[in-house]
Amino acid sequence: MSFDVPADRRYLESHEWAQPDDDVVRVGITDFAQDELGDIVFVELPSVGDRIEHEAEFGVIESIKAVSDLYAPVSGEVVAVNDDLEDAPELVNDDPFGDGWLLEVEADGDDYESLLTADEYEAQIA
């Protein structure tokens, strides 16, 4: 099976993605991760103003099959969360790289550079 792995972002081995836009980094889970989890029924995210740390747990995603921790690809302050997921968690399944994004972080540091490239992540899930 083939999964989308957009080249315009970087990846954690735990299947989260990061897409920078200046100092703000948008975060979500990969197409591979949403497929493995199955139908997403609940997403627990931090609040705006909370701080998250690179590779530390920042939330939980729940499907009909499993509950999984979410890990931060970058460190920084949460500046936005995707409130649409509260009423429509299935957006993560439908569009994991678009409408199903999880949160945005004002990154402080160079964690992004240490993440896997699209090619490296693709090799991991092959």
Swiss-Prot record:
Primary role: The glycine cleavage system catalyzes the degradation of glycine. The H protein shuttles the methylamine group of glycine from the P protein to the T protein.
Protein name as it appears in the record: Probable glycine cleavage system H protein
Any one of the GO BP annotations: glycine decarboxylation via glycine cleavage system
PANTHER family: GLYCINE CLEAVAGE SYSTEM H PROTEIN (PTHR11715), GLYCINE CLEAVAGE SYSTEM H PROTEIN-RELATED (PTHR11715:SF3)
SUPFAM superfamilies, per the entry: Single hybrid motif
GO cellular component: cytoplasm; glycine cleavage complex
Organism annotation: Natronomonas pharaonis (strain ATCC 35678 / DSM 2160 / CIP 103997 / JCM 8858 / NBRC 14720 / NCIMB 2260 / Gabara) (Halobacterium pharaonis)
InterPro entries per UniProt: 2-oxoA_DH_lipoyl-BS, Biotin_lipoyl, GCV_H, GCV_H/Fam206, GCV_H_sub, Single_hybrid_motif
Cofactor binding annotation: Binds 1 lipoyl cofactor covalently.
